[in-house]
Regions:
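Short S/T/G/P-rich N-terminal loop/turn motif that feeds into the first structured element of a domain
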Residues: 1-50, 56-70, 77-96
Length: 96
């Protein structure tokens, strides 16, 4: 499995997460199209928030980045949020 964490902070981050919460059904529908999606979480932080996506492989994780980027460009470009800091890697432990 491969995980991607997108951390949004700074200019526009709180507004972006307000919009993501308001449009969570749309966000969920778009991410469910990602091949090999295992899980997705959206978390608020003091200065914005982060998303954690786990996919069966790196190809799915890469597609999740594209889906997120495209959604923000289409539906949240007016917010002008700073780009996320992206961290990704192979999952070594999973607890269910």
């Amino acid at each position: 499995m491969h995980a991607v964490v997108r951390n949004y902070s700074g200019a526009g981050a709180k507004q972006l997460f307000d919009l993501l919460e308001q449009r969570k059904g749309d966000v969920e529908a778009n991410l469910r199209k990602v091949p090999g999606l295992v899980s997705y979480m959206l978390l608020r932080s003091d200065d914005g928030g982060m998303s954690v996506t786990v996919c069966k492989d790196k190809a799915g994780a890469d597609e999740s980045l594209k889906v997120a980027r495209d959604w923000i460009q289409k539906d949240a470009s007016n917010i002008h949020a700073n780009p996320p800091v992206v961290t990704e890697g192979s999952v070594i432990v999973e607890i269910k």
